[in-house]
């Protein structure tokens, strides 16, 4: 692996977003809620091998955009980008991406508060729902212009921006795969 051993112990938690999405579907079904919900679990085995991604590889995301790999540790967003594009084919009213996307979120908000980013309306509704259920969430912006840190000379964008604003930058990257008008 490319991570230091101390960080590898935490990687089993990288599937927490997919687990939360799956459990949400089970809970909705058990409660018999009158809603139509689909969960897209963006799953991948991340192991080094001769066919693993390398720095400077250019990948084509589902839907056609190309991404230059500049950081092999920013791999989760590549899988999520595929899932976001595919999920939009179902014309959903709302897409909620649940992910342990970046350690920058923990640096910014600690271990108990989740950062929430998105359109103002959707983000605010999620924060209110979280408050009602006792889950601390904090609304975060997606600064305009943040996507410029993902500029690439060989692809539509890179998979990693600069070091500042890591959580916000990761969201700006994923926003590139969501069509205008989708919440």
Protein language model annotation of sequence segments:
Residues 1-183:
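A generic structural signal for tightly packed, nonpolar segments enriched in small/aliphatic residues
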């Amino acid at each position: 692996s490319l991570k230091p051993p101390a960080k590898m112990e935490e990687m089993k938690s990288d599937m927490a977003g997919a687990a939360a999405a799956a459990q949400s579907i089970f809970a909705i079904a058990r409660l018999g809620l009158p809603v139509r919900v689909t969960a897209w679990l963006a799953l991948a085995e991340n192991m080094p091998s001769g066919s693993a991604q390398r720095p400077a590889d250019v990948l084509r995301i589902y839907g056609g955009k190309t991404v230059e790999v500049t950081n092999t540790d920013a791999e989760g967003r590549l899988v999520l980008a595929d899932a976001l594009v595919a999920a939009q084919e179902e014309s959903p009213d709302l897409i909620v991406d649940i992910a342990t996307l970046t350690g920058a979120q923990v640096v910014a908000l600690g271990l108990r508060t989740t950062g929430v980013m998105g359109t103002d309306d959707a983000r605010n509704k999620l924060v209110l729902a979280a408050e009602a259920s006792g889950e601390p969430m904090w609304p975060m912006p997606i600064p305009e212009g943040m996507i410029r840190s993902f500029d690439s000379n060989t692809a539509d964008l890179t998979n990693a921006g600069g070091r500042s604003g890591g959580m916000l930058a990761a969201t700006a990257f994923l926003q590139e795969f969501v069509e205008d008008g989708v919440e």
